[in-house]
Amino acid sequence: RICSMTQKERQERSRKEIYQAALEEFGTYGYDKVNMERICGNHGISKGMMYHYYSNKDELFLLCVERTFQELRAHVERDMAHLSGEDTAAAVKDFFMIRERFFQLHPQQKLVFESAMLRPPKHLAAQIQALRAPMRRLNQEFIEGLIDKMPLRPDLKPEMVTRYLETIESLFQNMIVSYQGGHPAQDFHAMLETAGELLNMVLFGILRHADPA
């Protein structure tokens, strides 16, 4: 079968092999601990083939980031369709949990995502934000639709709440782990319960409001 491959098929096969190797390395060790030699050595890829397609680890890291954003966006779009009939608090929780469900299924992409969003290499920050733009637009559109249904405090503008929920969404996994004392949830059901507790406080606050006189 390999001998009968066209040149295009061989190129696609080589690129896929390199991508899978890079994803495994970046998705296990993060950006800083990975280099081209490590990827080649750990996965039996010749340096000649590697450098024929990619000139440095930044290209490979950005490829992993781009694919992660693309696959996460497709996953979120697919599951978002089921949230339209929910009340706003439940929809916010389930929207946040869509992403966590994706990362439970794809733990290597979870570390790539966290490396890109929480610990981005400074020289790649602008490119990462550009790659994230379609995902961010999807988040904004959904959050803005939710906010239209929310009885907001009179001192809050919708754009402020959009930025707030976007910020919470990007940090939500770390918030869950921290809230649980640094220990990840044992299963998805436990994570859902924790998410519900956290979002109750995020959305409704922790201070008892004084009764009107």
Model-derived features with residue positions:
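Helix-turn-helix
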Residues: 13, 17, 21, 25-59, ...
